[in-house]
Amino acid sequence: MLSGITTNRLMDSMDALDTILKMQREYMEMIDSRRIGERREERISKLCTAIIHEACELQNLTNWKWWKSPSIFDEEKAREELIDILHFVIQISIELGMDAKDILSAYARKNAINRERQLKGY
């Protein structure tokens, strides 16, 4: 069991992640591959740039600009921007040859490291 997650819930999560990976692969088949780049490193670099820009779009929905009058936070738009980021993160996972099991395993490993750091006052 992973941090209190039941086996059934873990399998459901894996199925959901598999579905997301499949949907992303199918979506990328629709895009002219020459637009994103020939080399894997180039594709990953462009995807990282896309993540940065989408993260800025998400940040712009918050009231981080102290010099401007605050606006109402649009949670629905924020969710949309977050999913845009997820598209690019999932595509990088695919570029790195990761499947749902690889993603979960790497996440669990890094999560354990982060938890240990917190326990040590990081």
Annotated model-derived regions:
Residues 1-122:
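Flexible "arm" and connector segments at domain edges
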